[in-house]
Amino acid sequence: MINIEDISKSSNQSEEKQLKSTSSKPKYSFAAKSLFKGSNNITPYYLSTSNTFQCVASESIQTWLLSDDGHIFTSSGNFVLDVSSGGYFVELVQLNSNSKTQIWTIDTTNNKIQNQGNGNYLDIDCFNICVAPLNGNATQQWTTFRRAPIPTGNWGYFQSKQLNSNNYWGLSVLNNSTSYNTSVVMNKVQAKSKGQIWQMTSDGHILSRLDGNLVLDIGPSINGSTTNYYLNTNVYKANDLMQQWGINENNQIFNQYYPNLCIGFVGQLGVDSTVNCVLAQPSSACDTYFQFIANPTYSLNQIVGEVPEPFPAYTSGDLLASYQYLSNDATSNFTDDIRSLYTGINVSLQSFLSIVTNATCPSSIHSTEDFSNVQNQIKTELIYAINVRLVFENYSGFYSKLFSQGSSNLTNLANLINVDMSSNQMVNANYTDAITSIFYSLISEIPVGGPIIANIGQSAVEFGELMSQSNYQGASTYQVELSQLYTHLNTNYENEMANAQSMKDTILQDWGMMSKTYALCFLPTNDPSSLNMNGLDFDEISDVASVAYEIAMIQMLLPTTYQIYFTPAGYWVPYSDGDFAYSDNSGTYIMATIEYSNSYPPKELTDKLWNNGVSKQEFFLSAYGWNLATSLTYYNNTKQHNNIFKLAFPTIKNFTGVPMQFVMTNEGDNLGNFTVKTHFAKFFSTYYSCGEAGHHYFDIAVTDINKNKVANFTVDIKLKALEGSYVSIKTGSLVVQPGYAVGNPICNQGSYSLMFSASILIPIYKSE
């Protein structure tokens, strides 16, 4: 049974099972809002897999996929709406293509959703979803719409809908402070300002790029008001509705605890350098002081998900004759269907346009009006197609240039890092992460212009994933032998080029998609949906992207040669700062080779890191794209810790948007508990005891911040006489909960002679 409930009573629940759909029909995303207002006459109700409430960031429970044969799927495509065996309540079940009760018709004119099995209409019964005969009640009226794009899982800006000249303003952490309880304000978006970049998580938190657990929160009341508050940052808290947000169809960011209050600002953009953000009630749905747009919007991703809209059909009479005449005339009698060439690579649409524009009605066509109508339509289509193709040609040129030196760049980096590219050593080569990091750099460093490239590129990535969704198995760690790394990267490069080409062709074969895409080509470059490349500095864009891709390749190669050596605060270390060292309150981190803790990287390598803006904190703590295992060592204090070579210290890397916790136990004894921030790694730094030669097993349990299980596994430490310990995950011990994936661990041996521990890094991903 599917329930309906207003926001004040709602709970954010998702599907409990993950079952594969067998449908291969195209699906189009939509949400359905009831026109029934309920007792409070304020809060809207939405069709949901659990409760129905205002549009939230965790839109999976309120987003539905309509297939072209009338099935309504959940957002993951795992279940469909069906009428129960009793013929009244609506429930979620697996697809049965032979069941008519699973087929629905959405009538957007009369706001009805009708079941084809029994002819009844979607209705509400005490906040439960049911079907009933047509009765004229508001409970049977539903308005369907596409959501305001929400950047769930992607980094970007929350930009005010009020544009200011060539600049735009966005939600900003004051002074880029990582301290909790810092004010959130409106500032003009600046390059390389992490305090203006956010990520909306699946549970509705809005993460700051400044730090792993820093989120948007409600601040103090304004003059004691219960309906007006300031905004600030805070540490990520579990099940705290004040930290959970949603975006409705009016582009308003509302709070889950105060659902009628939205984020806005007080002041004039462009007049004041900093404008205070508030949580208050908008004056109307169109109040631009309370409207924000996620930038980039990934508008192309939205467009290709639209219900297809065919070109105007010409099937008979002078309309058909006119279309065929113009097609033959423009293509020199190659085809009487000019639309079939919109996707052609070796054709000149500009030449076609010139011929069609100058064509005159032949005597064989009697209706000059029909001829003129067809001529104007084809001219419009050609103009649209020319501009759409130009957008993708510019993107393909950028993308090809970016990867044109791939082989030589990879070879040079391998030599610098001292990697044997002919070996069968495995490396984590996540191409999608590499591409995403490039788009992040463009967004961050070129706020006006960079999002346009990201809009196309990220949409192409997601379009490719959508096309292969039936084979999607969750997060891939792309384990590749070093000898096959270049081939792997090149294959993925070609696949992404093909994805962009396929997305372009999809748009060019659909009148609605082509019209919408054409409109984006002429938006101002600071509009978050813009595809307007006029005036973009492609040299600057290429430079930023090239550096980002080089950093991504370093992230792949570095763990094969180097690791981090950690020494707790208060102990002597050979270096506390410099090119290969970093210190914080917990201790000192030094980068050196896996075999020798006193063999440091060359300056040419560290210059590529620090001179290109890599954060030392993120690097040494294995945050975001960095994944270096961490070993524990005490250098000249080995007498006090002379068993260090016997030990292995795990590092858990959290690739998700939700904080995690892990505990390590040995035969029931708790050895330590640690919290892992979002997008960061956490090193198990508690000293413990281990036995003599042989295998020793330590159990690790990982949960999310809400205490839900994520993964369990056993670390196997193997000891040999006068050798550093060997470490691995015990075969058969790994248990991963649905919705997560555990990547291949990075395992490094300890050292008896240099007295450092073994290290193991275990990456955990979200699997959709």
UniProtKB/Swiss-Prot annotation:
GO terms classed as biological process: response to cation stress
Keywords: Cytoplasm, Lectin, Membrane, Repeat
Record InterPro entries: Ca_Up-reg_Membrane_Reg (IPR051780), Ricin_B-like_lectins (IPR035992), Ricin_B_lectin (IPR000772)
UniProt keyword Phosphoprotein present: no
CC terms in the record's Gene Ontology section: cytoplasm; membrane; nucleus
Cytoplasm is among the record's keywords: yes
Ricin B-type lectin domain segment(s): 1-107, 100-248
Gene Ontology MF term list: carbohydrate binding
Region (Disordered): 1-22
Broad class of the protein's primary localization: cytoplasm
Highest taxon of source: Eukaryota
Membrane topology: Peripheral membrane protein
Swiss-Prot/TrEMBL induction comment: Induced by high levels of extracellular Ca(2+).
Locations listed in the record: Cytoplasm; Membrane
Protein family per UniProt: Belongs to the cup family.
Record function comment: May play an important role in stabilizing and/or regulating the cell membrane during Ca(2+) stress or certain stages of development.
Name of the protein in question: Calcium up-regulated protein G
